[in-house]
Amino acid sequence: GYEGYIPREASNVYEQKFGDCKDMSSIITCMAKYASIPNVHMCWIGTRDIPYSYKELPTPLVDNHMIACFEFNDSTIFLDATDSQTRFGLPSSFIQGKEALIDQGNEYKIKKVPVVAAQENQTKETIKIKLENNALYGNGILNMNGLIRTDAVYLIGDALERDRFEVIKTLVEQGNNKFQLNNYSEENIENKDLPYII
């Protein structure tokens, strides 16, 4: 029914300390009002799983998600509270290229979410190898940016020790089933504004 499209009051979300995408959008817009930040609106949006636009199918079937957006000057920043690992300013990967229906009180407008440029999602890898006793040995640095970084950090999740070692190994093994990882270190896993480095 339509309840899936209607956000709850921010005060209820705050009391419950829990909410879905609609609830998170509601609390973001309410917090912005309390902080005197203008032009923060709720937006209905379809994820990339839904192939329709509002022009093709002007019904609620176009939407299965809710976010907030912040409009200033001629820019719009799309705020998806369900994606905790993407850096501020980038849209989450599952809403890129989709149309957002932006609530403006008694009116609405439709705005397309930009697709993140390829250079924002670069992976840079440096590997130094040597041949010794008929085996290749080496070390390397894997530097992940943008949504590539987001995917890697989600893949790792909160894995600890042995599980984390295995997840890291899958990220760096180059598709070779004879690859052995001896050790690794990580940088910037907590800082979304910097590349994640293994």
Task: Show which residues each predicted segment covers.
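A sensor for short, sequence-defined functional sites
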Residues: 1-198
